[in-house]
């Protein structure tokens, strides 16, 4: 299954979860899209619940199925900690996600575009790979030629608050992941245990 590139609002309504972090997708129509949407949230089987939870997390970070599964396998090889949370930490450390958390982009999709287009530096070097794994303490900044890109400036201005696990200098347009987040600081609406159960059956 490839990465979803369709309308994020429609996908958010299908999953019952905001994918932009604003909640606007669900503000007016908190039901699945389609003619029978308001009455179409049928009871899911155990497998259906696990699959739905996996899709929620995957679409939240905008990651393709193959890459998502590979990250789970990597998380399963980490000896310390809890598998489900370790998996979420690997997703959090993606460069596109850190760019989003810093407020340099309004959505993860936009952050991924900024990385792909070469606007983002890591410790002063351009990195155009959205899946690049950020280490706490690395400096994420905007390259000099991109400092006046309107979309980036608008995103910074629109950001009202940032997570406690990042730091950001609005004048320099740079910041860092200061530490790994705690479980209660990310995706409280996700039940990662269901995702672990899903992949334990599949792998």
Curated annotation (Swiss-Prot):
CDD domains: S4. Residues 93-156 form the S4 RNA-binding domain. GO terms for cellular component: small ribosomal subunit. GO terms for biological process: ribosomal small subunit biogenesis; translation. Pfam families: Ribosomal_S4, S4. It comes from the Bacteria. GO terms for molecular function: rRNA binding; structural constituent of ribosome. Keywords: Ribonucleoprotein, Ribosomal protein, RNA-binding, rRNA-binding. Transmembrane segments: none annotated. Gene3D superfamilies: Ribosomal Protein S4 Delta 41, Chain A, domain 1, RNA-binding S4 domain. One of the primary rRNA binding proteins, it binds directly to 16S rRNA where it nucleates assembly of the body of the 30S subunit. Part of the 30S ribosomal subunit. Contacts protein S5. The interaction surface between S4 and S5 is involved in control of translational fidelity. Belongs to the universal ribosomal protein uS4 family. This is Small ribosomal subunit protein uS4.
């Amino acid at each position: 299954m490839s990465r979803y590139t369709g309308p994020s609002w429609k996908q958010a309504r299908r999953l019952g979860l905001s994918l932009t972090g604003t909640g606007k997708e669900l503000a007016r129509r908190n039901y699945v899209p389609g003619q029978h949407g308001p009455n179409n949230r049928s009871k899911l089987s155990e497998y259906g619940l696990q699959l739905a939870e996996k899709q929620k997390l995957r679409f939240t970070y905008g990651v393709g199925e193959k890459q998502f599964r590979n990250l789970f396998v990597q998380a399963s090889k980490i000896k310390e900690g809890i598998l489900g949370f370790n998996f979420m930490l690997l997703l959090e450390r993606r460069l596109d996600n850190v760019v989003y958390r810093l407020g340099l982009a309004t959505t993860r999709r936009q952050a991924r575009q900024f990385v792909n287009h070469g606007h983002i530096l890591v410790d002063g070097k351009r990195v155009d790979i959205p899946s690049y794994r950020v280490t706490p303490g690395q400096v994420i900044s905007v390259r000099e030629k991109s400092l006046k890109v309107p979309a980036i400036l608008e995103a910074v201005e629109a950001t009202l608050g940032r997570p406690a696990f990042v730091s950001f200098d609005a004048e320099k347009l740079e910041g860092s992941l200061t530490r790994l987040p705690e479980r209660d600081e990310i995706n409280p609406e996700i039940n990662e245990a269901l995702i672990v159960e899903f992949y334990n059956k599949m792998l």
